[in-house]
Amino acid sequence: RFITNKSSGKQGYEIAKSLSKKGFDTTLISGPTNLEIDDDINLIKVETAEEMFLATQKNLPADVAIFSAAVADFKLKKKYQNKIKKQDMLNLNLEKNVDILNYVSNHNSMRPSLVIGFAAETDNHDKNAEEKLNKKNCDWIISNDVTNKNIGFNSDFNEVTIHYKNKKINNEKLSYKKKSEISDEIVDRVIDQLN
């Protein structure tokens, strides 16, 4: 038994495919999923936020880092080796996981040229995404509305807004379409930014 969310990883896998298709040497650090990826993509499978953090550290430096995974903010303070038996009441103590996006975007010596985070929002989408953009010190935040059942978690479709730190560029809404198409549009903008 474990604490998780409904994220499928589909958007991250599609972004990795788009990057590879456009000629990027691509590493995908993936949490548990049954999704498949092309052989030319370096796939690193992890099960915990801590494993994802360590794998990320090992794969720096990079030109671009895109953080689309819905990594758990908290973990159990104490891990249980055996099944916890049913009881009337159970209190679980949690502690914070390392904030991987924050770590990478503030890493002085190995910070990628472009750091992109994702924000799964339920309300105040633009305000929350802008706050995350500034708080985490990333270059872009890509937000979506996870209360909309037609997009986001487990869907093959998405609709996102790209929030840019560089305010000379207007924030952009990428309208409802397949996650593969959203990924292609994101990667096209990555290429434009790097050139």
Segments from the language model and where they lie:
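Short, small-residue-rich loop/turn micro-motifs
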Residues: S30, A70, Y164-N166
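Hydrophobic/aromatic residues located in beta-strands of well-ordered beta-sheets
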Residues: T26, A65, V115-I116
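Glycine-centered flexibility sites
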Residues: S8-G12, G31, A72, G117, ...
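A glycine- and small/hydrophobic-rich beta-loop-beta segment
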Residues: P32, E36, D40-N102, N106
